[in-house]
Amino acid sequence: MALDEIKYQTYVQILKEELVPAMGCTEPIALSYCASKARDILGTTPTRCLVEISGNIIKNVKSVIVPNTNGLKGIEAAVAAGIIAGNANKVLEVIADVKKDQIKEIKDYLEHNCIIVRPLETEQIGRAHV
């Protein structure tokens, strides 16, 4: 096998190991995944949620339509979708199977529960300016 073929096969193998299917834009989906995972760990639906994320994620998600939510947009919608309809076992396809009745539940959750979004400040990230 030629060196170029070995390199090619190595790259293909890395891609097979590292790439995972995702439903829509990965940043809101990542928030849905985290929210779904948190709900699973808590063992109940939380009545309030604090989301501390980097300014870049805030900027990239605040106006994005969250898949399978009938046009809901933004961080809060992504989090609520994960809490109400997410399946954390599906990782980045966490909200691929949202049912119509769950969309109403997501909207109700957004209306009646508190989701606070704050810029995350760490030594690595620094102060976010949003």
Predicted region positions:
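Acidic-glycine-rich active-site phosphate/pyrophosphate-binding loop
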Residues: 1-12, 45-59
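Conserved active-site and cofactor/substrate-binding residues in soluble primary-metabolism enzymes
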Residues: 2, 6-10, 26-33, 70-74, ...
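C-terminal binding/interaction regions
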Residues: 115-117, 125-126
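Generic N-terminal amphipathic, Lys/Arg-enriched alpha-helix
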Residues: 10-23
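Conserved small/polar residues in nucleotide/adenosyl-binding loops
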Residues: 128-130
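Hydrophobic alpha-helical scaffolding
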Residues: 21-24, 65, 69, 93-96
